[in-house]
Design a protein with these regions (language model features):
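N-terminal binding-site loop/beta-alpha segment at the start of enzyme catalytic domains
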Residues: 8, 17-110, 169, 175
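Beta/alpha (TIM)-barrel catalytic core signal, keyed to glycine-rich beta->alpha loops juxtaposed to Asp/Glu
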Residues: 34-35, 152-242
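Structural preference for beta-strand elements that scaffold enzyme active sites
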Residues: 45-49, 80-81, 109-115, 143-148, ...
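Acidic-and-aromatic substrate-binding clefts and catalytic sites of carbohydrate-active enzymes
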Residues: 58-62, 85-95, 119-126, 155-158, ...
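Generic structural signal for well-ordered alpha-helices
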Residues: 71, 94, 98, 129-136, ...
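Structural motif corresponding to the early beta-alpha repeats
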Residues: 104-129, 150-153
């Protein structure tokens, strides 16, 4: 196994996103959120995503040459899902996505997810728009295949997303063609997850932490979260799979 292959193997196992295959399509009635169809076709997703959170460094900076090789090898394997966020790698992850992926591969050849951090929206609603515009500029992607509210959890975090009307705002971004699918990554309780999914049928996908070790963990409660997702027939992504 080459050095690059070993690095990719480490990256996939410790910073990957694994996908469930629960649902093909959902339709909501006009009485709820209007007559619209949400179609997250998980059958088209790869089994492993490429997480852009923990990336190799050289001399204190992200190692672009190494990252490009990893991205190329991942795409060559037939997989195409990349996950980043505004704050990853000290705020440099989205920019490295532009250099290693967006500028080097056709836009239609990959799927890109990024996330909105409520705790960095210092200006409130204006901060929400500033961050989103920064993300478009940083990545150069033109649009995001998946856009997630980042690390939703009980308390002030979720209250902030509600206060700044992020759910309706994201739907408008979808109508503008800047987001294809909308959801959130989640670190809260099963009760909060149930509340959000019951109140926001516009949500198309959820990302949770799930693995065998955390299935009955009283802090993470992977098993109970999974049951809530099944209740709503909700497609989901898995972080921290091993």
């Amino acid at each position: 196994m080459t050095k690059i292959q070993k690095t990719i193997d480490f990256q996939v196992h410790f910073n990957a996103t694994i996908f469930s295959t629960i649902l093909r399509k959902r339709r909501f009635s006009a009485e709820k959120k209007g007559d619209f169809t949400m179609s997250v076709d998980v059958t088209k997703m790869p089994k492993l995503g490429f997480g852009m959170m923990r990336l190799p460094e050289k001399d204190g900076e992200l190692d672009l040459e190494q990252i490009c090789k990893m991205v190329d090898a991942y795409l060559a394997s037939g997989m195409n899902y990349f996950d980043t966020a505004y704050m990853y790698c000290g705020g440099k992850s989205e920019s490295i996505v532009k250099k290693a992926l967006v500028e080097r591969h056709p836009r239609e050849s990959f799927t890109l997810t990024t996330k909105l951090p409520q705790w960095m929206m210092d200006e409130g609603i204006e901060g929400r728009d500033r961050i989103f515009n920064d993300q478009l500029a940083r990545t150069g992607a033109g649009y995001f295949d998946y856009y997630l509210l980042h690390s939703v959890e009980d308390g002030a975090n979720y209250d902030g997303y509600v206060k700044y009307d992020c759910f309706n705002w994201a739907r408008k971004k979808k109508e503008e063609g800047l987001i294809k699918h909308f959801g959130f990554s989640f670190h809260g309780t099963p009760e909060l997850l149930d509340k959000i999914l019951s109140e926001h049928p516009e949500v198309e996908i959820v990302q949770i932490q799930m693995n065998y070790a955390d299935w009955d963990n009283p802090l993470i409660q992977s098993g109970r979260l999974y049951e809530v997702l099944r209740k709503y027939n909700m497609p989901f992504l898995v972080m921290e799979p091993v």
